[in-house]
């Protein structure tokens, strides 16, 4: 399997990396979050820009990013506009979604960009090309907040992401039962054994918490923890998360 190196973080080896989301609505709130995150043992910061009140003004988005980057100069930043259809805060058209992501990827000020799988393929491929030209890694994602698809479907989506050029394919699904969590873990194990790229998977909500902890066993390269406000159901406090990941890593 290929390792994916972003600044001082290597995905695809050792314990799963910890990503903590920033969800501030204003520049002041984002600066406060970034300063707090300086004090936390994390690997990646995800800026959930769909929470940002001035997201439709690209100059203001870049200015806010500059403020975050000043406070967190060495921390990998994952730039994510989560669409409303996949659980995000704001509904926007496809044209704006791609303009926003391509513009910010072109600045060279982000390290990773989230690209949702279920979009027009030509748009997805163009955004991946723009990202890679600017040395930005692509986290290609899919989120199902209603259910856990069949194992074959989860495997198919992750495999498709890699085929399209994702550096880190990602899927998050909602369990209705413990069996659904096992389905996600089984699919993760199957894909990670044959994939060329590290993958990121999780089963959400309380039932799925085990999937956020067991990535090193089943083959998920990153997990999401909460420092202030969780951006998805089931996210664990980042300090508790690090403790458990370290404990499992020592036994592995």
Curated annotation (Swiss-Prot):
Binding locations of 3-dehydroquinate: 46-48, 82, 212, 231, 235
Active site: 143, 170
SUPFAM superfamilies, A to Z: Aldolase (SSF51569)
GO molecular function: 3-dehydroquinate dehydratase activity
Enzyme class: lyase
Known pathway: Metabolic intermediate biosynthesis; chorismate biosynthesis; chorismate from D-erythrose 4-phosphate and phosphoenolpyruvate: step 3/7
E.C. no: 4.2.1.10
GO biological process terms held by the UniProt record: 3,4-dihydroxybenzoate biosynthetic process; amino acid biosynthetic process; aromatic amino acid family biosynthetic process; chorismate biosynthetic process
InterPro entries in UniProt: 3-dehydroquinate_DH_AS (IPR018508), Aldolase_TIM (IPR013785), DHquinase_I (IPR001381), Type-I_3-dehydroquinase (IPR050146)
Domain of life: Bacteria
Keyword Mitochondrion attached: no
Catalyzed reactions: 3-dehydroquinate = 3-dehydroshikimate + H2O
Family as reported in the entry's similarity comment: Belongs to the type-I 3-dehydroquinase family.
Complexes and interactors: Homodimer.
NCBIfam families linked to this entry: aroD
UniProt protein name: 3-dehydroquinate dehydratase
Lineage, highest ranks first: Bacteria, Bacillati, Bacillota, Bacilli, Bacillales
